[in-house]
A protein has these predicted regions:
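Short, surface-exposed, charged loop/turn segments at secondary-structure junctions
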Residues: 143-146, 163-167
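Conserved Radical SAM active-site core
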Residues: 3-41, 45-149, 153-158
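N-terminal amphipathic/basic-hydrophobic helices that include classical n-h-c signal peptides
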Residues: 1-2, 188
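Short, solvent-exposed loop/turn segments at secondary-structure boundaries
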Residues: 105-108, 162-164, 199-201
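Conserved strand-turn element in the central/C-terminal portion of the radical SAM core barrel
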Residues: 166, 178-200
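Surface-exposed alpha-helical segments enriched in charged/polar residues
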Residues: 84, 118, 175-178, 182
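Charged helix-capping and loop-helix junction motifs
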Residues: 109-112, 171, 201-202
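Active-site glycine-rich loop that binds ribose-phosphate moieties when present
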Residues: 169-175
């Protein structure tokens, strides 16, 4: 039983289709990335690059719109089409740069992410994953070349409740990471700083 199941299970209410999925990036976690969800239910209150970018270009209209994630319903079909073209170019495919592959409490997003990672691994490509949600124990059954990470901004869960209201509690993130680590998976933690003086941070 995955840890997030102790909380409420949330439902995806929006779906979109895309023409492409995989693209080249300079992000430090991989040389290619994919974003199979638009938006992020974690709703971070400090400046979020992904939210600001998507709002600027009209992909979302408001913070509330951003916090109601839209799942790319043709994710697996796009991977079937694109992986043969990219498989000899990709060193590491990162999930995800502008969203979270394991949004806290979203079964449907979790299942799509697991299916995508399996499909990517079956093509001989390893993945890196970064989340503020819960890394599911099912990842243990996928390639041990994959790299699984969590983001932590503060160990104060009161801060998390104020500034990352939809994200997983810190102890649950760490506990899930420990399960994968003890099962022999490659694991890591990203520590992010924040600016206390920022207007959005109060």
């Amino acid at each position: 039983k995955d840890l997030y199941e102790v909380g409420s299970v949330k439902k995806v209410t929006k779906y979109i289709s895309r023409k492409t999925l995989i693209y080249k990036t300079d992000v430090e976690y991989g040389d290619y990335t994919m974003n199979h969800v638009l938006g992020c239910s974690h709703g971070c209150k400090y400046p979020c690059y992904a939210y600001l970018q998507k709002k600027r270009f009209g992909n979302v209209v408001s913070y509330e719109d951003w916090c109601a994630p839209a799942l790319v319903k043709n994710t697996l079909e796009l991977l079937d089409h694109e992986l043969p073209k990219f498989k000899n170019k990709i060193k590491i495919l990162h999930l995800c740069f502008t969203t979270d592959p394991f949004m806290y409490g979203f079964d449907e997003i979790q299942e799509m992410s697991l299916s995508a990672i399996k499909k990517i691994n079956d093509a001989g490509i390893k993945c890196s994953v970064l989340t503020k949600g819960i890394l599911p124990t099912a990842l243990v059954n996928l390639s041990k070349d994959n790299e699984y990470g969590i983001t932590i901004v503060s160990l104060d869960d009161g801060f998390r409740e104020r500034m990352e209201p939809g994200a997983a509690p810190i102890i649950e993130r760490l506990s899930a990471l420990k399960v994968l680590h003890e099962a022999g998976c490659k694991t890591w933690v990203r520590f992010n700083g924040y600016f206390r003086s920022c207007r959005l941070c109060g």
